[in-house]
């Protein structure tokens, strides 16, 4: 499942600036939204391929393969593991929240972006590869070392998105920004789905099914008994990122060196812009209410993504094979969520669309935590020894099938909410201040990024229950939903 990109001021400002420049320069070459020569087709596609490079990390490490392995096998206790995973992600979220505005200011200063991207890729690739040595017991990396690696990768991943976003206005022709942005998202989704299918074919199904096209043994000598089919997610993510980041580094043009503000001046100017816009929010209470609402429900949705695989693995004792299929199913249905969100928005308006999406997510989460191997919907007991639905080595019981059905709906609603949220701000913000408010929109997506994981981690530890920890996300969704009800779907008038 792919989280919708939160565009920073540079990206969103391009939407306004596009009309200020002619479609082509004097030499007939298309101009970008910044007025410079746009990249050629190879450079544009290479920019989009960077999403193909980055997205498998999210699915393999953060959601479906490595995180459940870490919490259940390396830590060895699903409850303690979920609490630790919450703490790890809350620390990463806090670092991102503190530094993202500074990095955003540097990116918006107009200097070179590719050196920064090279640094972040250079950090992410080896740190992710090193997760291969995350083994249970004393022979592998310690839990503390693994935690540090995860925090480093998560922070570098978030910062790489800031600089990748900021390249878009100078790479794409001013009439193709939307197309190129969409191409990047599509490639990101496709890359994640492809790598999950490859993991299924190469490492998860061999030896588990007798289908003719499936190898008898895991490829490359992977030893499933040593959990290498889960640990390989680290090296695959790292190598995938490194090699598919190369096209951007080689073929996508960067801005030339110029007399732009230095690092310190860029940070100072960017901070001043953020503070100025925050102060102006008192004149735009309706927009401010929406941004605060979005901050809460976005944190809740992100927490569901981060902990969904961890929770399912702990409650149902799913192995790597089942989790991989689980990820593939959700990724496919999440694509439909984007279309569903668009239909809701066009038919009922952004506010109703968001209310339906958040409400559907909350109801789905409540239903999800109501299902366990011994209980359906909190009140209906279920015999865990009841006959299986089928002989396949995944989703073979009624509770598992019900859980997957509910989580499929959650995936659809979350994707729809991400799509509707950006449209809602476009309907509310003053037309002449769209760039500034989309900058705040991006900031609201990171300002409390630590909150969801922190709540889940604390609640899991306090109640010693994965169900209680996962259910605590309902608090964030509820606050966000309540605040959205207070928002009026009308455009604010700019105040100078």
Labelled PLM ranges:
Residues 203-239, 390, 397-398, 458-477:
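A membrane-interface helix-boundary motif in multi-pass transporters
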């Amino acid at each position: 499942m792919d989280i919708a990109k939160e565009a920073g001021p540079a990206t969103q400002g391009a939407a306004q600036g596009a009309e200020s420049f002619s479609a082509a320069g004097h030499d007939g070459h298309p101009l970008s939204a910044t007025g410079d020569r746009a990249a050629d087709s190879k450079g544009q596609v290479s920019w989009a391929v960077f999403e193909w490079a980055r997205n498998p990390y999210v699915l393999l490490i953060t959601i479906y393969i490595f995180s459940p392995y870490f919490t259940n096998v390396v830590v060895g206790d699903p409850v303690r593991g979920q609490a630790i995973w919450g703490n790890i992600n809350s620390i990463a979220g806090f670092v991102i929240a503190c530094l993202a505005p500074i990095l955003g200011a540097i990116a918006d200063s107009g200097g070179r972006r590719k050196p920064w991207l090279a640094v972040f890729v250079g950090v992410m690739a080896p740190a992710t590869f090193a997760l291969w040595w995350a083994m249970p017991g004393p022979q592998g990396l310690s839990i503390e070392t693994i935690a540090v690696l995860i925090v480093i990768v998560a922070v570098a991943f978030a910062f790489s998105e800031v600089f990748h976003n900021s390249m878009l206005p100078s790479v794409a022709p001013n009439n193709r920004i939307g197309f190129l942005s969409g191409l990047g998202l599509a490639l990101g989704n496709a890359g994640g789905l492809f790598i999950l299918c490859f993991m299924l074919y190469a490492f998860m199904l061999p030896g588990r099914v007798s289908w003719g096209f499936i190898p008898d043994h895991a490829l490359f000598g992977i030893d499933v008994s040593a959990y290498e089919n889960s640990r390989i997610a680290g090296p695959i993510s790292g190598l995938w990122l490194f090699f598919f980041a190369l096209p951007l580094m080689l073929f996508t043009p960067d801005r030339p060196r110029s007399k732009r503000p230095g690092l310190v001046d860029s940070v100072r100017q960017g901070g001043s812009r953020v503070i100025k816009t925050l102060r102006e929010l008192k004149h735009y209470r309706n927009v401010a209410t929406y941004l605060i609402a979005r901050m809460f429900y976005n944190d809740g949705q992100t927490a569901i993504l981060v902990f969904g695989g961890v929770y399912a693995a702990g409650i149902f004792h799913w192995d790597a094979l089942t989790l991989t299929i689980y990820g593939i199913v959700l990724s496919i249905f999440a694509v439909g969520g984007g279309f569903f969100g668009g239909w809701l928005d066009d038919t009922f308006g952004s506010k109703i669309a968001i209310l339906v999406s958040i409400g559907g997510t909350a109801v789905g989460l409540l239903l999800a935590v109501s299902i366990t191997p011994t209980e359906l919907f909190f009140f209906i007991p279920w015999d865990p020894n009841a006959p299986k639905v089928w002989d396949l080595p995944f989703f073979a019981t009624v509770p598992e099938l019900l859980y997957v059905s509910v989580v499929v709906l959650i995936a659809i609603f979350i994707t729809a909410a991400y799509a509707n949220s950006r449209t809602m701000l476009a309907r509310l913000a003053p037309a002449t201040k769209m760039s500034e408010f989309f900058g705040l929109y991006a900031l609201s997506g990171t300002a409390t990024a630590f909150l969801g994981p922190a709540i889940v981690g604390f609640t899991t530890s306090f109640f010693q229950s994965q169900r209680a920890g996962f259910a605590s996300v309902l608090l964030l969704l509820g606050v966000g939903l309540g605040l959205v009800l207070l928002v009026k779907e009308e455009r604010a008038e700019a105040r100078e």
